Amino acid sequence: MYSGICICVFLAVLSASSFGQQTAGSHNGNPLAAELEQSLTEHHRHVRAPSSAGPLKPVPRLDGSIDQRANIGALLAKYLQQARKGPTGRISVMGNRVQSIDPTHRINDRDYMGWMDFGRRSAEEYEYSS
């Protein structure tokens, strides 16, 4: 996995450096290539130039900055209120479930939220004589 990532990074660096050398040294005394590249850049400029249909009209903007600030303030107040209450939802329910585990449980030291060890649990259920 690590070697695959290294190879991808190496190929990306190699292609970027070869692309940079190709554009910088593409003319090499060839006037036809220089002329072609210049005409392409001019064509690109013409395509991107604004149309001569007339001056652009500014888009009318609604003054929603006051409403937006009030909305952000309300959301911030709601968040702070919930943060002061403490954990809610799924996390608090899972915390109650973890506390209700029987203390004589064989593997109670490994029972915590979000953790499963299938191999050890199945191995401990069956007593293997080796």
Curated annotation (Swiss-Prot):
Name of the featured protein: Cholecystokinin
Pfam families: Gastrin
InterPro entries to which the protein is assigned, alphabetical: CCK-like, Gastrin/CCK, Gastrin/cholecystokinin_CS
Location relative to the cell: Secreted
Region of interest called Disordered, as start-end residue ranges on this chain: 40-59
Task performed by this protein: This peptide hormone induces gall bladder contraction and the release of pancreatic enzymes in the gut. Its function in the brain is not clear.
Removed propeptide positions: 21-48, 122-130
Tissue expression remark: Highly concentrated in the duodenum. Also localized in more distal parts of the small intestine.
SMART domains the UniProt entry points to: GASTRIN (SM00029)
Top-level taxon of origin: Eukaryota
Keyword Secreted: yes
